[in-house]
Amino acid sequence: MAFEFPASFRFADSHEYANADGELVRVGISAFAVDQLGDIVFVDLPDVGDSLDKGATFGSVESVKAVEDMYAPVAGEVVQRNEAVLASPEELQNDPHGEGWLLVLRPSDPSQLEALMDAGTYGTKVNAG
């Protein structure tokens, strides 16, 4: 199965995405990661106001197969979290690049986005597998 990814998204090696929207960055996990996890049953996210370091664990996603940590693709302050995904983890599974987003961050260093893979590079990486 070949995966397609929104062109504006940037991706970490650990399959989290960052999508800049003005001064904020929306964070989630890729459709590839969701597919690998299988049926998602629980999502744990940080609280609004928490500060995240780039590469640091910011929560976990539990599926019938495994529990996986998620890592911040950029450093910043959590300004919003997706309560709908917390209440209904299947939202993440149904639309990981849309309604299944996880966090909105105010990045402390927006230039960190440039170090992430663009959608084409990430797509080549995961589709080659």
Curated annotation (Swiss-Prot):
CDD domains attached to this UniProt entry: GCS_H
Cofactor(s) needed by this chain: (R)-lipoate
Keyword Flavoprotein found: no
Residues that bear N6-lipoyllysine: 65
Record SUPFAM superfamilies: Single hybrid motif
Entry keywords, A to Z: Lipoyl
Assembly with partners or alone: The glycine cleavage system is composed of four proteins: P, T, L and H.
Protein name per UniProt: Glycine cleavage system H protein
